[in-house]
Amino acid sequence: MKYAIGVDIGGTNTKLGVVDEKGSVLKRHEFKTTDYDNFASYMEGLIQAVSFLTSSTDGECMGVGIGAPNGNYYKGTIDYAPNLPFGRSAPIVETLRMAVGYEHIYLSNDANAAALGEKIYGGGRNLDHFIVITLGTGLGSGIIIDGKLVLGADGFAGELGHVCAVPNGRLCGCGNRGCLETYDSKINDFSSYRDFIHKDKENFINDIKKIFGRSN
C-alpha cells in the first residue's frame, strides 16, 4: 500500500493523518502545538509524530504534505505566523526532510491545503470557482479559480484574517490593528460577543426573546 502523511499545523493543535491514494484517512495522531515555545523544540515533536506513524503503518510512504498558517509554498518556510512561536522564517520542509529522509515534502498555507482537498476529494470536485474559509486559532481562506489553487506572487493569496476590518481596532499578533481575525476566530469570538453585549445589551436581549417567542 502506498500512502502519504498529512500534517495540519494549528496555533493550538497539530494533527496528522495517514492518507491512502483514495484520500481516506487510515490513522490519526495529534499533539499540542502550544506545548512548544520555539521552532526547534516543536520540530522534535513533529519528527517524532511522523516517525511514529510511518513505523506503525504497513506500506510505502510517498511523502508528507503540510498545511500551516503562513506556509510559503515556494520557499518551504513558515513566515511570520502570528499564532506560532516560530520566528521570522522557519525552514520546516528542509528540517523535516533532513530528519526523515523523504524527498517529497510539500508545504502550503493551511487554508490553501483545505481548498485543494475540497477540490480533489470533497465538495468542490465539480466546481471551478470557490473559496474555503477556515476558522480556528486564526482565520484564513483558500481560493480556487478556473479549477486551480490561487497562490499569489509570494504564496500568501487569500490571507483573509489579516484584511483590515476595523481601522485602528484591536491589536493583532501580526502587529497591525483591526485585522479580521481579531474579531472572528476561535479565540476572539467571545471578545466580540462580549463587546457587542456591552454596547447594545438591551436590543440583544429583546432579539433573544423574539427568537424564543417564535420557537414556541
Regions found by a protein language model. Give the residues of each.
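Glycine/GP-enriched mid-protein hinge/lid loop-to-helix segment characteristic of carbohydrate kinases
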Residues: 17-19, 27-29, 39-41, 106-108, ...
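Short glycine-rich, Thr/Ser-proximal phosphate-binding strand/loop in the N-terminal lobe
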Residues: 3-44, 77-79, 155
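Short glycine-rich anion-binding loops that position phosphate/pyrophosphate groups of nucleotides
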Residues: 12, 69-72, 136-138
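Short glycine/serine/threonine-rich phosphate/pyrophosphate-binding segments
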Residues: 13-15, 113-115, 138-140
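Glycine-rich phosphate-binding loop and adjoining helix at the ATP-binding site
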Residues: 34-35, 39-47, 51, 59-64, ...
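Short, basic/aromatic recognition patches
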Residues: 2-3, 128
